[in-house]
Amino acid sequence: MESQLMKLAIETYKITLMISLPVLLAGLVVGLLVSIFQATTQINEMTLSFVPKILAVIGVLILTMPWMTNMLLDYTKTLIKLIPKIIG
C-alpha cells in the first residue's frame, strides 16, 4: 500500500511539472530575450519586460490548455478509480 502511495505521489509531481513547465519556460525565455534586448539598447523601461512575458504566458496557456485539461482529467479519473484500493 505504501509503495502504491509513493507511486501516486511521484506521478503527481510528474504531472505538476509537465503542466507548469511550458508556461514557466515561456516566461523565462521571453524574459531573458527582453533582458538581453534591454541591455544592448540600454532601454530600462519596466513595462517593456512585463508585457511581453504576460503575452507569452497567455499565448502558451491558450495553446496548451486542451492538453493540460486532458492530462488533468485523465489523472483525476485515475485517482477516482484508485480510491477503493487505497481505502480498503
From Swiss-Prot:
Assigned keywords, A-Z: Bacterial flagellum, Cell membrane, Membrane, Transmembrane, Transmembrane helix
Compartment(s): Cell membrane; Bacterial flagellum basal body
Pfam families in UniProt: Bac_export_3 (PF01313)
Gene Ontology cellular component terms for the protein in this record: bacterial-type flagellum basal body; plasma membrane
GO biological process: bacterial-type flagellum assembly; protein secretion
Top-rank taxon: Bacteria
Keyword Transmembrane helix: yes
Membrane topology type: Multi-pass membrane protein
TM helices/strands, residue ranges: 17-37, 48-68
Function: Role in flagellar biosynthesis.
Family under the similarity heading: Belongs to the FliQ/MopD/SpaQ family.
Protein name per the record: Flagellar biosynthetic protein FliQ
Native source species: Helicobacter pylori (strain ATCC 700392 / 26695) (Campylobacter pylori)
